[in-house]
Amino acid sequence: MAQTVRRASKANRPNADDVRTALSEGYCTHQDARHVFETALDAPGVRDVVRTRLAQTARALIVDEIFDANALDLALVRLAADAGLEVTVVGDPWQALYAFRGARPEEVPALTHEARFVQRDLHTSFRWTSPRQALLAAELRAGLGQILPKGPAETTDVLIALQWKSLWEAGAHVLPLAYKSTTGNIQEAACTLVLSEVTQRMFSEAATFHADALITLGITHDAAQRLRPLLQSIVDDLESTTDTAKVWSALNAAVATETDRPLPKRPHATHIARLKNLSTRLRNSSRLVPGLTAHQAKGREWDVVGVRLTDAECAVLRQGLRADSEDHRKLYVALTRARTRTVLVPANEL
């Protein structure tokens, strides 16, 4: 059985020799293991062995979020059903958001039909605590067009948008929990660690891609704890000074104490802007509102949710949503995170 490990802490992009050495010692990534297994299932003999093994070792299988399943996930569900296990799959086609990860929600109906699943629809949600929020969700699912009531961001518990960029443009009283969807860039990862210190200070919650930033920088858990006092000092500097170039240099020096990644010698305008955005929010006297995208908000709930939508997204909402469009499903998820009320936060209210 191959062992699965995280990317080596000293290699942001491991070379071929390192990969071959790791594989020869029985180490691989989770994705490597999935790829090998998926390929092996194409061989009839292997499928038979897996089916028999499932029948011998398991009685039942419960799969949540089935509409986020990729090809391998669906293949295993099929095998479990063929092996005679009691298989239950749970999911909402309106909340399938992970096509970029290989999810295949369009294949789920065929799976449940071919495997003769009995469908039981759930019509009650314990999230809604107000009739209007329950009505909004029902009408969205029915494809009815919507014009949301407007409200200021300050009265909401969270602001949700479909893109991180929209959240950073939402004003100094909104603090998004990420800069963008990836932290593969070294300096982007360093800025994410500073952002994470701010979000922990303000919301008791780490930045969305905090763990990814540590991996990009090759920083272990223990090293991250040693680094925190330096990062907290940098946050204090951002709050008290407008010299972000000086803060950038201090950030580079701090991160260099715990990583051997090659840090840039000159500041890039994008990363200076990142620090300036944080500085502006730290000096803001009003309550900060956390900002999340629909992807990060999925599965969570708040009492009052504000949404920031583009003109094009508002136009789509007025026409009505369709479950077969991922962009429409993102809007549905954003608009159904509130227990009591969802409001549109227009640009002139930010």
Regions found by a protein language model. Give the residues of each.
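The feature marks helicase ATPase cores and/or their adjacent C-terminal helical subdomains
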Residues: 1-350
